[in-house]
């Protein structure tokens, strides 16, 4: 009998704690100071508003997303509803990534590269959350 399943079982709580606490802290930060997120979301929100009438402000959308990430991050960190929490976090990261790391719009090569790295990092985070949801 291999020890791999046992080792995975022992690592799962630590992985959830590390992953979830990151989202909890960052989401809470957005709730406390939504301004930078509102600025980052402006272009994406403007594009959405061209297609759909939204009865909420950009700041409300950013705050709700921050609250969602904080709450689901905390749940994941505590091991409560981990699959659902991971799935919701992955879903919330898609618009966050598209709003915050629009590397394809950057003209400065250095800024473009930095945003591309952050975009790819977020994609990896989404992949990790999906993996956590399946595990």
PLM features: what roles do these ranges have?
Residues 1-135:
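Short amphipathic, positively biased membrane-proximal segments
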